[in-house]
Amino acid sequence: MADNRDPATPADSPRSGVTRRDFLDRGSRIAIGLGALQLGLGRSAFGDVLGMVGKSRAGELPAESTIAADEVTLGNASITATWTTTSGSFRPAKMTDGLNKSSLPVPAQAFVLTFADKTTLNASDMRMTSPPQTESLAADPTASRKSERVAGRKVTISMRDTAGRIEVVWSGVLRDGSAYLRQEITIRALEGEVPLREISLVDFNAPNAMVPGTVRGTPIVIGTSYFAFEHPLANNGVDGDRIRCRMGRTLPLRPGTTIEFSSVVGVTHPGQLRRDFLTYVERERAHPYRTFLHYNSWYDIGYFNKYSDADALAAINAFGTELHQKRGVTLDSFLFDDGWDDSKTLWRFNSGFPNGFTNVEAATHKYGAAPGVWMSPWGGYGQPHADRIAYGKEQGFETNKEGFALSGPIYYKRFRDTCLDMIRRYGVNQFKFDGTGETTNTFPGSPFDSDFDAAIHLIGELRTEKPDLYVNLTTGTYPSPFWLRYADSIWRGGEDHSFAGIGTSRQRWITYRDADTYENVVRAGALFPINSLMLHGMIYAKQAHNLMTDPGNDFTSEVRDYFGTGTQLQEMYITASLLTPANWDTIAECAKWSRSNADTLVDTHWVGGDPQRLQPYGWASWSSRKGILTLRNPSNVAQDITIDVERAFELPPNAPRQFLAKSPWAQYRGTPPVRFRAGQDRKIRLEPFEVLTLEMSAV
């Protein structure tokens, strides 16, 4: 369950707010039957789909750090930075792009702090309290974050302002094999409250910079390099030739408390921006990409109504039997959406669950899965929302105009404790957090700057408890890739489901879903990975408006289109009794295909046109093992799309030049393969509403 998302404030600059279409004008072109759409293309920086760092690659690009005289250097063959510490004053000196044999722009300051009275404190005006330190970072094979599974180097400098109000610990971090360098700062108030209002981590002048998106938390791109404050609420902006990456703050910094922020600078091979940036995202996100197939109760047993333990068990057993036992499908979770709680309490089970999720957990384990649960930080929707708010106000839980205030200390504790109890008592492996609340306003007495800030801290606490937890952060998010430092997926925007274009209700639903993705994500956040969206799944359920039947036999098209997106959050909003054996077979075939091709589908990116305009479109992904192309025609007339696999797959220079394409689906087994040659256009005819899936192997 989700709702229309809140609009994100764009970065504050004339050249901020570049749409993906504008951004991709600098890339290569794919011709389609209705015109041409620009695609930003590139070759992998590390020789496979994402340049995933294995032992050999990390060994080829080891991080090194040195401290000599008044210089501190951190780097590898891809990127190197040097800072000076002359007379105890810390300043950036130079940065080198080893991939492109060029220099990178250097800020005058490592950071700048701005206070409520508009005064500023530069890093160079602070005084080092100890000599620079360098240390090795050990690889932790059990870490959730992939970068932490790789060794590296870290340099650290501690400093204080001359008034003795603030201590800052600055660190430069580089992991082996990385083509990016991260800057981390920890700020601590020493005596009295410090009215800190803004932290700037990147500020310099450079021509031809751009922000490839219209939402906050979008990286700045300059040629083959990128710069960003690593936070979804940050303002990464371009104003003329001035580049700034900064983060506002509302609350004063209390004595003894600390806050942490970070930034990144990365380099890419020419034409490689999307894929090489995706490499960075995959390494630094909370958890790497993974397929996560699960049932969701919304539209089935719950739709603004309460359901029971018996209802949940029936759904678990139906899906477990049909998919896991009969068809050998791996199921990851069974998520119970709105309706499990008594909305006249606050996140307590309704009377239909006398033992909580105890029976649910046992049932999911029979099929190799675990329970998941929906919770809404702001309290949900409709009458259940009104009931929760009314009860919450009586009990003293904090509220704001959106509903509950997660930044309120009392409510935060109840919400956090409920989440931790779900993990500890019932083995919950997934949270769907639906509706986060205020992005900027602070609740009086809160330790958090906003409800979103509270949500980020909450997720951190939950991941400490369960590192492989799946977190789906829905309403209120937008396509900043830095949400993925905390959550596994975010909402595509728009309605849960609606209809667009022409054809049957199911075809119009597919068009609506994909058009929303194109408009809200592909165009608004060029560097956000499509693989990490909540798309609102496959829908065939008894309480889903106009999607409780399939008179046009379009369900197979919906399922193949859905898995072709490469999304890792694979949701089934399905009533088991409505499906035929053939429907179950389709889901099973596609789910197995997706899981076995995750190493390729992680690279999924958009190709073609605008579904809303009934233009043919789809998704392409490539790895050294194969290429995958999924295409759809949203029109009731046949249309052509012209594909050059070199451009569609962003082939590296050493990749094969010829491919044989065939469908992976059993119904097309025996169909002769079709040859594609890199650098040559090939016209593909798509019949009305056709969904075509092609796997391409090198000749």
Language-model regions, residue ranges each:
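Active-site groove signature of glycoside hydrolases
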Residues: 329-340, 416-445
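N-terminal export signals
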Residues: 22-46
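Acidic, His- and aromatic-enriched active-site or binding-groove loops in soluble protein domains
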Residues: 353-360, 393-405, 491-505
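Conserved structural scaffold segments of CAZyme catalytic domains across common CAZy folds
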Residues: 132-386, 569-612, 621-627, 636-641, ...
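N-terminal secretory signal peptides
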Residues: 1-22, 46
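Beta-strand-rich N-terminal accessory domains
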Residues: 48-135, 143-156, 161, 168, ...
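Active-site-proximal substrate-binding groove within the catalytic cores of carbohydrate-active enzymes
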Residues: 76-77, 95, 256, 455-668, ...
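Active-site-adjacent "subsite" loops/lids of carbohydrate-active enzymes
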Residues: 303, 372-426
